[in-house]
Amino acid sequence: MSSTLSVPAQAPETGTARVKRGMAEQLKGGVIMDVVTPEQAKIAEDAGAVAVMALERVPADIRKDGGVARMSDPDMIEGIISAVSIPVMAKSRIGHFVEAQVLQSLGVDYIDESEVLTPADEVNHSDKWAFTTPFVCGATNLGEALRRIAEGAAMIRSKGEAGTGNVVEAVRHLRQIKNEIARLRGYDNNELYAAAKELRAPYEIVKEVAELGKLPVVLFSAGGVATPADAALMRQLGAEGVFVGSGIFKSGDPAKRAAAIVKATTFYDDPKIIADASRNLGEAMVGINCDTLPEAERYANRGW
């Protein structure tokens, strides 16, 4: 009589860097939209968003209202999770790892350690390796991006200036990151060691970026994207997707604008499709000239 040995089923990997980065990879090419109600979340999903960001106030309102901006109410987040089938993100304050723990317990798909909220720690960001939920973090330059990756971030977004409806800072930050990556490509090991010191980032990650010619995680763009052309611009500059905050639900026709931005993000290299997507969208959100913003009101300066 022959016998067969049963091999115990191997538990699936959870919470590893490979798994968390793989989850973020699934969002490539898409649009992530800020929403404040389940109804807005459904509009975003129907428009083709790959994920939604659940928060109580969009950045434009946070900027207008002032005060301390904190993690959103758990009931509101759970209401949005229940309303849609696409992934749901939520924001924690920089360095507020307990807010991040709460968000993980709620079952959000991604945590955004966000400069849009008021930082809780002026020295430390959260240790993202301590979580099974993947983190998204903002960056204005390559050094900032690599420091967040070293802390465990599974996705980077160039910061831009949230809540302004002005894409100029998004362009500046994405170009800065891409240009600094290109500069590393021709470096030998000695130069990479010097670059790591200059960037204040681990040598191993700097070397990996030089070899890949890109970040080892997904790179999206955020902050000021308000029109289909804005979204296509960021994609043509090298963003692998876009976040849209106030630009949709502060506009005249949110559902139509949301669908148009998704279409332009997908067909970002086809001017005719972008033109068609841009027709008859109603009023865009009221923009802010970033040059007039006082230093203390520049969200992109938060983080280090």
Curated annotation (Swiss-Prot):
The keyword Lipid metabolism does not apply. Pfam families: SOR_SNZ (PF01680). Pathway: Cofactor biosynthesis; pyridoxal 5'-phosphate biosynthesis. Disulfide bonds: none annotated. Keywords: Lyase, Pyridoxal phosphate, Schiff base. D-ribose 5-phosphate binds at residues 34, 163, 224, 245-246. GO terms for biological process: amino acid metabolic process; pyridoxal phosphate biosynthetic process; pyridoxine biosynthetic process. Signal peptide: none annotated. The active site is at 91 (schiff-base intermediate with d-ribose 5-phosphate). Its EC number is 4.3.3.6. D-glyceraldehyde 3-phosphate binds at residue 175. It catalyses: aldehydo-D-ribose 5-phosphate + D-glyceraldehyde 3-phosphate + L-glutamine = pyridoxal 5'-phosphate + L-glutamate + phosphate + 3 H2O + H(+). GO terms for molecular function: pyridoxal 5'-phosphate synthase (glutamine hydrolysing) activity. It is an enzyme of class 4 (lyase). Gene3D superfamilies: Aldolase class I (3.20.20.70). Catalyzes the formation of pyridoxal 5'-phosphate from ribose 5-phosphate (RBP), glyceraldehyde 3-phosphate (G3P) and ammonia. The ammonia is provided by the PdxT subunit. Can also use ribulose 5-phosphate and dihydroxyacetone phosphate as substrates, resulting from enzyme-catalyzed isomerization of RBP and G3P, respectively. Belongs to the PdxS/SNZ family. In the presence of PdxT, forms a dodecamer of heterodimers. This is Pyridoxal 5'-phosphate synthase subunit PdxS.
